[in-house]
Amino acid sequence: INGAERVIVSQLVRSPGIYYAIGHDKFGKELYSSTVIPNRGAWLEYETDSNDVFYVRVDRTRKVPVTVLIRALGIGTNAEIKELFGEEPKILKTLEKDTATNYQEGLKKLYEKIRPGEPLSVDSAESLITSMFFDPRRYDLAKVGRYKFNKKLMFRNRIAGHRLAQDVLDPSTGEILFEAGVRLTKEQADTIQNAAVPYVY
């Protein structure tokens, strides 16, 4: 360019959000995968295998059963996981594969995959997971990512018809969109989804 040597590297930047894919194993069985891409922070890649075991990769590391991540996020025991997901066959198959049985073991197993070879302790694992996923300076879906996430997960349909236990705030302005006690109509649920509200109670 203008007499100077330059190297042009093309790069594909994917927008924050959640992406789904379906593949097939050698017998033609459908294998599902999804990737959660934040604006800033670790990617989460989910996939199923031919045995219906559900795995996750955190930031392109080696895969672990998804129940390891669930335990590390605070839902530690098999009973708590079953209470949350019901008798979902893929979760039951995954629990059979998962050697961890509680929160601390889940934390340690996940830490081993993310930081192989480093000294292992519950405190260091806890601090890593907290900083990776719960520190807004390190993990952020951004408004567009949150909007797309909510839209793909049909957030609107799941909250319509329910009564709010807490006020719903607009994450951009802090203003109250709907007050506690309101039973949400589809239009109100739409407003909440379009405002990229991360959660409601």
Predicted regions and their residues:
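N-terminal non-catalytic structural scaffold regions of very large proteins
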Residues: I1-Y201
